[in-house]
UniProtKB/Swiss-Prot annotation:
This is Conotoxin Kt6.1. GO terms for molecular function: ion channel inhibitor activity; toxin activity. It is found in: Secreted. Keywords: Disulfide bond, Hydroxylation, Ion channel impairing toxin, Knottin, Secreted, Signal, Toxin. The lineage of its organism: Eukaryota, Metazoa, Spiralia, Lophotrochozoa, Mollusca. One of its GO terms (cellular component) is extracellular region. Expressed by the venom duct. The keyword Secreted applies. The modification 4-hydroxyproline is found at P60, P63.
Length: 79
């Protein structure tokens, strides 16, 4: 009986804290989609061109680099 009461009270407490947190953070994440989009653009794997030492099988090398060693597995961007 005591354990059941403790569980019920803890669930109510956690639910109340979640609701309070949701109310206070409702307007804090404006433009979240735009921020995530900008973060995705800055990821190393999301660049439009391959940097030095990266593979150039599926995307072209960055300016100033060329694709060398283009065998069956693709080449590597080198200056």
């Amino acid at each position: 009986m005591k354990l059941t009461c403790v569980l019920i009270i803890s669930v109510l407490f956690l639910t109340a804290s979640q609701l309070i947190t949701a109310v206070y953070s409702r307007d804090k994440q404006q433009y979240r989609a735009a921020r995530l989009r900008d973060e995705m653009r800055n990821l190393k794997g999301a660049r439009d061109c391959g940097e030095q030492g990266q593979g150039c099988y599926t995307r072209p090398c960055c300016p100033g680099l060329e694709c060398l060693g283009g065998g069956t597995g693709g080449g590597v961007c080198q200056p």
